[in-house]
Regions:
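Structured, helix-rich domain cores that form ligand/interaction pockets
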Residues: 1-180
Length: 180
């Protein structure tokens, strides 16, 4: 599943977008959170036109967006992602085929018949490197271009129906994505 992402500046009509979101652009930097997505507006010089105007970046979880901001622990298929892309274009004018991605998270949820902590405790190394703790929910390996995370999804989202769900996730940075 695809989950978290962060974009570069988007070619949007920020006045219309801020109006649609109900956001007043009255300071240098404005952030607005909506159902797992965070719209970040920054007043800056547009390098294409040379004018001072608000530019917008988007980050967050497309998976949470589908669940109205509640969680990202259930199934999220490619068809769900395609529907989100259509909604983002229809509702906010965000064109997925020209949106610059700075990073993207993808992973898998695995329902286990036992606690995910058993798997987490058994995982020691990734390519000869030790994992670091991720609070009390899991472990991660940080490289320059990506992060590998293994954690207890039920513990993270604190929802009983996702008990014993192990999440294995990679957060890939732009330079990692370009290599592939």
């Amino acid at each position: 599943m695809i989950d978290g992402f962060k974009t570069g500046y988007l070619p949007l009509e920020t006045g219309k977008l801020s109006g649609r979101l109900g956001v007043a652009l009255n300071s240098h930097r404005v952030c607005h959170s909506y159902n797992g997505l965070i719209f970040g507006f920054v007043e800056m010089v547009d390098t294409d036109t040379g004018e001072l105007r608000y530019m917008c970046k988007l980050r967050g979880s497309v998976h949470k967006y589908v669940n109205r901001g509640a969680h990202n622990a259930d199934a999220f298929r490619m068809s769900d992602l395609c529907r989100v892309f259509i909604q983002l274009e229809q509702n906010y004018g965000i064109k997925p085929h020209i949106t610059p991605l700075l990073n993207v998270e993808f992973g898998v949820n695995i329902k286990l018949p036992y606690s995910p902590q058993q798997v987490i405790k058994a995982a020691c190394l990734y390519k000869g490197f030790h994992f670091a703790p991720m609070g009390n929910i899991g472990i991660e390996y940080k490289a320059a271009a990506f992060r590998l995370k293994i954690y207890d999804k039920g513990k993270q989202c604190k929802l009983h129906e996702f008990e014993n769900v192990l999440r294995i996730e990679i957060k890939a940075e732009r330079n990692y994505l370009k290599k592939r």
